[in-house]
Amino acid sequence: MSKKIKAIGFFVTAILVFAFACEPEMLYGTAKVAGSTPAGTNYEYGYSVCIDVTVDDQGKIIKVSDDEKNTEASIAADVIGAAASNKAYWKKYLSGKGFEKYKNLTIEDVKKMNVGFPGAPGVDAVGGATAASLAVKNAVLQALVLDASIKKLVNYKNPDNYKKGEQNKLEKIIKEGRAHLETLETYEEIEKALAELKQKLDALKTK
């Protein structure tokens, strides 16, 4: 094989690797619609928002969507008998283009968004749909923080720095930790659990 053909082969491979690395990633987030000024933070409306969050290779949001209408399915399955009013509020959120507020934002940007609280809307809430606005923010954060936390957990330690016995412990903590992170409902719970997992990994003895 000539040097020219080899060079072309390496170039094509490099392009494919780069293209794959830059491929957008779709994450899934969900959060209960909750909160009421008179009833308190634990009041629930009987449904959850279920959204997709598409991010680029830098973790910046390309799009937030619910193209499969999973939120509407959650509303339809409502057990407290408020499906009609909940559907109206969700429709108001969608018509207010709430998803578009997240375009080009990072995790930290989303955390800083001021959607307020039901009964006391913030500047980033969709008018008349504050509970839905808060739930979408929480769902987006759950998706982003879970993805980032799993990546941090997996890459936190280099297995080569540990003896075989400690490597087995390392793998066990990561495997079980990842499974645990995926069960958590809020981004705050995920961040707290990640910190605890890091402490466990820090306690392992290196070579």
Report the location of each language-model feature.
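Bacterial N-terminal signal peptides that target proteins for export
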Residues: S2-G9
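Bacterial N-terminal signal peptides
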Residues: F10-A19
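Bacterial Sec-dependent signal peptides at the C-terminal "C-region" and cleavage site
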Residues: A19-M26
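Active-site- and interface-proximal helix/loop "cap" or "latch" segments in soluble metabolic
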Residues: M26-K151
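Beta-rich interaction/scaffold domains
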Residues: S149-K207
